[in-house]
């Protein structure tokens, strides 16, 4: 949903939904209301001293990440932040969520904005089904039944004629999907799904501090619990990502970039699509501890799209909170990288140059205290979106079927490392929408049924959903677009590189290859792609409502590295030959 990097990064909110920055943190938790924070310890601090400081400030630790020194704390003390921040062992703190609010029918302003912009990912959805949405029968030798619909795999030569001939991946290579979960029972994921190592680091959040529904009532869950199993995806995003990386060659549906590697679900995203700090860093440090080789991160950490340490638009409290997000996330990235994890992240879908000043009106997008709403901020280039702009992260932009940078993809010379196909439904000769110019990957059947996208006989009734059957086994797939779809294709190539060149991992089994080597090969084997000529590229889109949208993005840099494509478009075949 909207919290992913598949949505527009910079939303324009209605004026009534905005509050000036001075108001944003004037709203405080009512006395006695239990609130949750994340507290970051000073590097090298004695954990016992930090724990004592939290207790002295009126907090109770409910979870602790000892790898980087981050604790989740509950408290009823409205002065907790000020009290704990004065301790020598504490680096900073940030709101996590309020607990125990009463559900109402209200919707948060940021959620309303999200509903307007999430069409970036699902543009074209809702059209009637085409006649050929169900496939069966025998494909060409070694090709999957839906291979002809995978223009994205052809673009990076992850095909039967390309990389599959030389390297399909090694079962011992582990790719962590830090996302909303993975449907481990999907027929085109299950053969490569590692349930033993998969974890869910989240707890469902029924409502925010304003009473707006977030994940919904826990009693409405299939298991009537706020703790989902580690093999489900009640959103659809994580399943699409996992399938793009490693759907097997099994005579059903599609194949991923690395069809023989193992997928590990490292769930850090809520059902609603929010990604909070503690689950995100827990997923990263766990990845390092258990021997994950590559992780894909197609999201940003809420509630701030951009984190600034000294933005005059923000209150001192907001600046301190954003500094905590930056420091804690970077510690987790450093930890995972040092443990041998290659970090791949989506560049974002705001259609913005991240090396230039922009305006963000979407943050804070989650109400941690009653009355909190997003407000407009001018964002200098020094502010960062985490984890995509973190050190050690390979930032991936998105291309369409023609190899142009997708209209929604963020860009910036020095920000983008590489490019990969993520789809562009307006990359058509007439600049009109074609859902098949998105990317096709696995879709949980339960969600397709819940959303009314299947007929009584199981056939899809919408154009963006495709069914593939092998005997009595049927699986579903959907078209999506976004840098969230580009990033896993790059992560899949990274997994192939580890499979091809990795050495035995004596600690965890399987293979291991230093991230710096993986990144070097990934960039060196990418197809160099120059800026368009002229570099100011105009995107024209004829929208379904009859209106026309025209935007211009300026590409800076050389063919060797530029703001649209970085070092080039990933090439699976060149990476493994």
Regions found by a protein language model. Give the residues of each.
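Autoinhibitory propeptides
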Residues: 27, 51-149, 404
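Structural recognition of the beta-strand scaffold that forms the well-ordered cores
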Residues: 38-39, 63, 72, 92, ...
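Mature extracellular/periplasmic domains of secretome proteins
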Residues: 163-170, 255-258, 274-297, 307-312, ...
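C-terminal subdomain of the subtilisin-like protease fold in secreted/lumenal serine endopeptidases
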Residues: 29, 62-63, 291-299, 476-477, ...
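Short, surface-exposed ligand-recognition loops at beta-strand->loop->(often short) alpha-helix junctions
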Residues: 36-46
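Active-site core segment of subtilase-fold serine proteases
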Residues: 135, 140-260, 282-324, 349-367, ...
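Secretory targeting and sorting signals
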Residues: 1-24
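Extracellular S/T/G-rich loop segment that most often corresponds to the catalytic His/Ser-adjacent loop
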Residues: 204, 369-495, 573-574
């Amino acid at each position: 949903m909207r919290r992913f990097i598949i949505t527009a990064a910079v939303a324009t909110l209605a004026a009534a939904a905005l509050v000036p920055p001075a108001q944003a943190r004037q709203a405080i938790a009512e006395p006695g209301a239990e609130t949750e924070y994340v507290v970051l310890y000073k590097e090298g601090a004695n954990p016992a001293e930090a724990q004592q400081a939290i207790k002295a400030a009126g907090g109770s630790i409910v979870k602790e990440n000892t790898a980087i020194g981050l604790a989740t704390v509950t408290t009823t003390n409205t002065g907790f932040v000020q009290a704990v921040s004065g301790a020598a062992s504490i680096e900073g703190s940030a709101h996590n969520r309020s607990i125990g609010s009463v559900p109402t029918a209200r919707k948060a302003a940021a959620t309303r904005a999200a509903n307007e912009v999430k069409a970036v990912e699902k543009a074209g959805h809702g059209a009637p089904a085409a006649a050929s949405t169900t496939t069966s029968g025998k494909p060409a030798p070694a090709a999957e039944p839906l291979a002809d619909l995978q223009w994205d795999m052809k673009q990076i030569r992850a095909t039967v004629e390309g990389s599959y001939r030389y390297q399909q991946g090694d079962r011992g290579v582990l790719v962590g999907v830090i996302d909303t979960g993975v449907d481990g029972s999907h027929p085109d994921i299950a053969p490569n799904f590692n349930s033993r190592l998969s974890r869910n680091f989240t707890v469902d959040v029924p409502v925010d501090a304003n009473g707006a529904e977030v994940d919904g009532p826990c009693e409405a869950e299939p298991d009537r619990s706020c703790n989902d199993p580690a093999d489900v995806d009640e959103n659809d995003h994580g399943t699409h990502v996992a399938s793009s990386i490693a759907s097997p060659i099994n005579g059903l549906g599609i194949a991923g970039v690395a069809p023989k590697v193992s997928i590990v679900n490292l769930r850090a995203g809520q059902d609603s699509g929010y990604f909070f700090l503690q689950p995100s860093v827990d997923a990263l440090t766990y990845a390092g501890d258990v021997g994950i080789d590559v992780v894909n991160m197609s999201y940003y950490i809420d509630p701030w799209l951009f984190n600034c340490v000294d933005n005059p638009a923000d209150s001192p409290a907001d600046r301190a909170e954003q500094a905590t997000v930056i420091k804690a996330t970077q510690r987790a990235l450093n930890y995972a990288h040092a443990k041998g994890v290659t970090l791949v992240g989506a560049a974002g879908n705001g259609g913005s140059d991240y090396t230039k000043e922009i305006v963000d009106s979407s943050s804070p997008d989650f109400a941690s205290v009653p009355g909190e709403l997003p407000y407009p901020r001018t964002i200098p280039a020094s502010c960062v979106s985490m984890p995509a702009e973190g050190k050690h992260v390979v930032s991936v932009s998105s291309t369409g079927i023609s190899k142009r940078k997708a209209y929604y993809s963020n860009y910036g010379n020095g920000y983008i490392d590489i490019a990969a196909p993520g789809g562009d439904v307006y990359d058509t000769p007439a600049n009109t929408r074609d859902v098949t110019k998105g990317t096709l990957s696995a879709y949980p059947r339960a969600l397709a049924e819940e959303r009314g996208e299947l007929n009584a006989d199981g056939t899809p009734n919408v154009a963006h959903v495709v069914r593939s059957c092998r005997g009595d086994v049927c699986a579903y797939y959907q078209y999506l677009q976004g840098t969230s779809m580009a990033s896993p294709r790059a992560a899949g190539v990274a997994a192939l590189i580890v499979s091809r060149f990795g050495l035995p991992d004596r600690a965890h089994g399987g293979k291991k290859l230093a991230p710096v080597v993986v990144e070097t090969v990934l960039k060196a084997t990418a197809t160099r792609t120059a800026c368009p000529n002229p570099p100011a590229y105009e995107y024209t889109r004829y929208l379904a409502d009859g209106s026309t949208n025209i935007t211009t993005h300026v590409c800076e840099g050389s063919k060797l590295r530029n703001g649209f494509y970085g070092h080039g478009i990933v090439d699976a075949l060149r990476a493994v030959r």
